[in-house]
Design a protein with these regions (language model features):
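Nucleotide and nucleotide-moiety/phosphate-recognizing core
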Residues: 7, 11, 57-61, 67-113, ...
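Transmembrane alpha-helical segments that form the membrane-embedded catalytic/substrate-channel core
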Residues: 17-25, 98-112, 187-196
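Short, non-helical or kinked segments that cap or interrupt transmembrane helices
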Residues: 34-46, 113-126, 153-161
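Cytosolic, membrane-interface loops and tails of multi-pass inner-membrane proteins
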Residues: 25-58, 118, 198-215
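N-terminal signal-anchor transmembrane alpha helix
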Residues: 6-31
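Loop-to-transmembrane alpha-helix initiation sites
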Residues: 138, 154-161, 173-185
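Membrane-embedded alpha-helical segments of multi-pass transporters/permeases
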Residues: 24, 73-74, 149, 166, ...
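Interfacial segments of multi-pass membrane proteins
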Residues: 48-54, 76-79, 103, 107, ...
Length: 215
Protein backbone atom coordinates (compact mmCIF):
# COMPACT_ATOMS: atom_id res chain seq x y z
CA UNK A 1 0.00 0.00 0.00
CA UNK A 2 2.89 2.36 0.74
CA UNK A 3 4.26 1.92 -2.76
CA UNK A 4 0.82 2.61 -4.21
CA UNK A 5 0.56 5.99 -2.49
CA UNK A 6 4.06 6.95 -3.59
CA UNK A 7 3.10 6.11 -7.16
CA UNK A 8 -0.24 7.92 -6.84
CA UNK A 9 1.41 11.09 -5.54
CA UNK A 10 4.08 10.90 -8.24
CA UNK A 11 1.43 10.46 -10.94
CA UNK A 12 -0.54 13.41 -9.56
CA UNK A 13 2.55 15.65 -9.38
CA UNK A 14 3.69 14.81 -12.91
CA UNK A 15 0.17 15.24 -14.30
CA UNK A 16 -0.16 18.62 -12.56
CA UNK A 17 3.21 19.72 -13.94
CA UNK A 18 2.18 18.67 -17.46
CA UNK A 19 -1.07 20.59 -17.07
CA UNK A 20 0.84 23.76 -16.17
CA UNK A 21 2.10 24.01 -19.75
CA UNK A 22 -0.77 26.23 -20.87
CA UNK A 23 -0.72 26.52 -24.65
CA UNK A 24 -2.48 29.88 -24.85
CA UNK A 25 -0.13 31.50 -22.33
CA UNK A 26 3.04 29.94 -23.76
CA UNK A 27 2.29 30.89 -27.37
CA UNK A 28 1.11 34.40 -26.52
CA UNK A 29 3.93 35.22 -24.08
CA UNK A 30 6.92 33.58 -25.71
CA UNK A 31 6.07 33.76 -29.42
CA UNK A 32 3.78 36.79 -29.73
CA UNK A 33 5.38 38.64 -26.79
CA UNK A 34 1.93 39.33 -25.39
CA UNK A 35 -0.34 37.76 -22.79
CA UNK A 36 -3.70 36.38 -23.83
CA UNK A 37 -4.92 36.93 -20.26
CA UNK A 38 -4.81 40.70 -20.79
CA UNK A 39 -7.25 40.54 -23.72
CA UNK A 40 -10.91 39.71 -24.27
CA UNK A 41 -12.37 37.59 -21.51
CA UNK A 42 -9.02 37.36 -19.74
CA UNK A 43 -9.12 33.57 -19.94
CA UNK A 44 -6.02 31.59 -20.87
CA UNK A 45 -7.86 29.29 -23.22
CA UNK A 46 -8.26 28.39 -26.87
CA UNK A 47 -11.42 30.42 -27.52
CA UNK A 48 -10.01 33.65 -26.12
CA UNK A 49 -6.70 33.09 -27.92
CA UNK A 50 -8.48 32.58 -31.26
CA UNK A 51 -10.69 35.61 -30.75
CA UNK A 52 -7.69 37.75 -29.82
CA UNK A 53 -4.93 36.59 -32.14
CA UNK A 54 -6.43 34.13 -34.63
CA UNK A 55 -4.11 32.75 -37.27
CA UNK A 56 -2.09 29.54 -37.53
CA UNK A 57 -0.57 29.94 -34.06
CA UNK A 58 -3.92 28.75 -32.72
CA UNK A 59 -2.80 25.28 -33.79
CA UNK A 60 0.19 25.65 -31.48
CA UNK A 61 -2.22 26.14 -28.59
CA UNK A 62 -4.20 23.08 -29.61
CA UNK A 63 -1.08 20.94 -29.99
CA UNK A 64 0.30 21.96 -26.60
CA UNK A 65 -2.92 21.34 -24.69
CA UNK A 66 -3.58 18.01 -26.40
CA UNK A 67 -0.05 16.67 -26.00
CA UNK A 68 0.22 17.55 -22.32
CA UNK A 69 -2.97 15.62 -21.58
CA UNK A 70 -1.68 12.60 -23.49
CA UNK A 71 1.66 12.67 -21.66
CA UNK A 72 -0.02 13.06 -18.27
CA UNK A 73 -2.28 10.04 -18.78
CA UNK A 74 0.41 7.85 -20.34
CA UNK A 75 2.78 8.51 -17.45
CA UNK A 76 -0.06 8.03 -14.96
CA UNK A 77 -0.87 4.67 -16.50
CA UNK A 78 2.78 3.63 -16.44
CA UNK A 79 3.03 4.48 -12.74
CA UNK A 80 -0.31 3.12 -11.54
CA UNK A 81 -1.62 0.31 -13.74
CA UNK A 82 -0.68 -2.97 -12.10
CA UNK A 83 -0.02 -1.30 -8.77
CA UNK A 84 -3.52 -0.35 -7.62
CA UNK A 85 -5.13 -1.95 -4.54
CA UNK A 86 -6.75 -5.31 -5.16
CA UNK A 87 -10.51 -5.59 -5.32
CA UNK A 88 -11.31 -2.47 -7.33
CA UNK A 89 -14.32 -3.27 -9.53
CA UNK A 90 -13.37 -1.16 -12.55
CA UNK A 91 -10.49 -1.42 -15.04
CA UNK A 92 -7.18 -0.20 -13.64
CA UNK A 93 -6.62 2.04 -16.65
CA UNK A 94 -9.79 3.97 -15.81
CA UNK A 95 -8.64 4.76 -12.27
CA UNK A 96 -5.22 5.91 -13.46
CA UNK A 97 -6.72 7.98 -16.28
CA UNK A 98 -9.26 9.76 -14.07
CA UNK A 99 -6.62 10.36 -11.39
CA UNK A 100 -3.99 11.74 -13.76
CA UNK A 101 -6.65 13.58 -15.76
CA UNK A 102 -7.91 15.39 -12.67
CA UNK A 103 -4.47 16.69 -11.76
CA UNK A 104 -3.63 17.59 -15.35
CA UNK A 105 -6.77 19.74 -15.42
CA UNK A 106 -5.84 21.33 -12.09
CA UNK A 107 -2.46 22.22 -13.57
CA UNK A 108 -4.14 23.73 -16.61
CA UNK A 109 -6.60 25.72 -14.52
CA UNK A 110 -4.17 26.75 -11.77
CA UNK A 111 -0.63 26.69 -13.24
CA UNK A 112 2.01 27.45 -10.61
CA UNK A 113 4.38 28.83 -13.26
CA UNK A 114 1.80 31.39 -14.47
CA UNK A 115 0.57 32.84 -11.16
CA UNK A 116 -2.13 30.13 -10.92
CA UNK A 117 -4.09 31.93 -13.68
CA UNK A 118 -4.88 29.31 -16.29
CA UNK A 119 -7.63 28.21 -18.61
CA UNK A 120 -10.92 26.40 -18.13
CA UNK A 121 -9.72 22.97 -19.17
CA UNK A 122 -12.02 22.14 -22.06
CA UNK A 123 -9.47 21.22 -24.75
CA UNK A 124 -7.29 19.25 -22.35
CA UNK A 125 -10.38 17.78 -20.73
CA UNK A 126 -11.74 16.80 -24.12
CA UNK A 127 -8.51 14.97 -24.86
CA UNK A 128 -8.61 13.26 -21.48
CA UNK A 129 -12.13 11.87 -21.93
CA UNK A 130 -11.20 10.53 -25.37
CA UNK A 131 -8.34 8.62 -23.78
CA UNK A 132 -10.51 7.41 -20.88
CA UNK A 133 -13.37 5.80 -22.80
CA UNK A 134 -14.98 6.45 -26.16
CA UNK A 135 -18.45 6.27 -24.61
CA UNK A 136 -17.70 8.99 -22.07
CA UNK A 137 -16.10 11.03 -24.85
CA UNK A 138 -19.10 10.54 -27.14
CA UNK A 139 -21.52 11.92 -24.55
CA UNK A 140 -19.26 14.82 -23.53
CA UNK A 141 -18.16 15.83 -27.02
CA UNK A 142 -21.59 15.16 -28.51
CA UNK A 143 -23.31 17.43 -26.01
CA UNK A 144 -20.65 20.08 -26.45
CA UNK A 145 -20.86 20.13 -30.25
CA UNK A 146 -24.65 20.06 -30.40
CA UNK A 147 -24.99 22.99 -27.99
CA UNK A 148 -22.29 25.06 -29.70
CA UNK A 149 -23.71 24.44 -33.19
CA UNK A 150 -27.25 25.27 -32.07
CA UNK A 151 -26.47 28.33 -29.95
CA UNK A 152 -22.97 29.57 -30.94
CA UNK A 153 -22.16 29.72 -27.23
CA UNK A 154 -18.90 27.84 -26.68
CA UNK A 155 -19.25 28.44 -22.95
CA UNK A 156 -22.63 26.68 -22.89
CA UNK A 157 -21.20 23.60 -24.56
CA UNK A 158 -18.15 23.72 -22.31
CA UNK A 159 -20.20 24.08 -19.14
CA UNK A 160 -22.37 21.13 -20.13
CA UNK A 161 -19.36 18.82 -19.87
CA UNK A 162 -19.27 19.52 -16.15
CA UNK A 163 -22.55 17.60 -16.00
CA UNK A 164 -22.24 15.08 -18.82
CA UNK A 165 -18.86 13.69 -17.76
CA UNK A 166 -20.03 12.54 -14.29
CA UNK A 167 -23.31 11.20 -15.68
CA UNK A 168 -21.63 9.25 -18.49
CA UNK A 169 -18.93 8.01 -16.10
CA UNK A 170 -21.57 6.49 -13.85
CA UNK A 171 -23.50 4.99 -16.75
CA UNK A 172 -20.35 3.38 -18.17
CA UNK A 173 -18.62 2.18 -14.99
CA UNK A 174 -21.14 2.17 -12.08
CA UNK A 175 -18.15 2.82 -9.83
CA UNK A 176 -18.22 5.17 -6.84
CA UNK A 177 -14.53 6.10 -6.96
CA UNK A 178 -14.64 6.99 -10.64
CA UNK A 179 -17.89 8.88 -10.11
CA UNK A 180 -16.29 10.91 -7.32
CA UNK A 181 -13.26 11.77 -9.45
CA UNK A 182 -15.51 12.74 -12.35
CA UNK A 183 -17.66 14.93 -10.08
CA UNK A 184 -14.54 16.74 -8.88
CA UNK A 185 -13.49 17.25 -12.50
CA UNK A 186 -16.97 18.43 -13.49
CA UNK A 187 -17.22 20.69 -10.47
CA UNK A 188 -13.99 22.46 -11.36
CA UNK A 189 -15.17 22.94 -14.94
CA UNK A 190 -18.42 24.51 -13.75
CA UNK A 191 -16.57 26.68 -11.23
CA UNK A 192 -14.21 27.98 -13.91
CA UNK A 193 -17.23 28.78 -16.09
CA UNK A 194 -19.23 30.50 -13.35
CA UNK A 195 -18.77 33.92 -14.98
CA UNK A 196 -19.89 32.56 -18.34
CA UNK A 197 -22.93 30.96 -16.73
CA UNK A 198 -23.88 34.28 -15.13
CA UNK A 199 -23.56 36.04 -18.50
CA UNK A 200 -25.57 33.32 -20.23
CA UNK A 201 -28.37 33.80 -17.72
CA UNK A 202 -28.17 37.58 -18.19
CA UNK A 203 -28.10 37.30 -21.99
CA UNK A 204 -24.75 39.11 -22.30
CA UNK A 205 -22.46 36.21 -23.22
CA UNK A 206 -20.54 36.54 -26.50
CA UNK A 207 -21.27 34.11 -29.30
CA UNK A 208 -18.48 32.40 -31.25
CA UNK A 209 -17.88 32.84 -34.97
CA UNK A 210 -14.97 31.53 -37.03
CA UNK A 211 -15.04 34.82 -38.91
CA UNK A 212 -15.94 38.24 -37.67
CA UNK A 213 -19.67 38.77 -37.75
CA UNK A 214 -20.83 41.14 -40.46
CA UNK A 215 -22.84 43.99 -38.96
Amino acid sequence: MGEFWIRAVAAAAIAYFCGCFNGAVIVSKYILRDDVRTHGSGNAGLTNFYRTFGGPLTFGVILTDVLKAIVALVVGGWLLVGHLPAGLPGPQEAYSDYWAGLFCLLGHMFPCMFQFKGGKGILSGGTIVIMIDWRVALVAWGGFLILVLLTRYVSLGSSSTGVTVPISTWLVYHDGILLLLSIIIGGHILWKHRGNIQRLLAGTESKFYFHKKVK
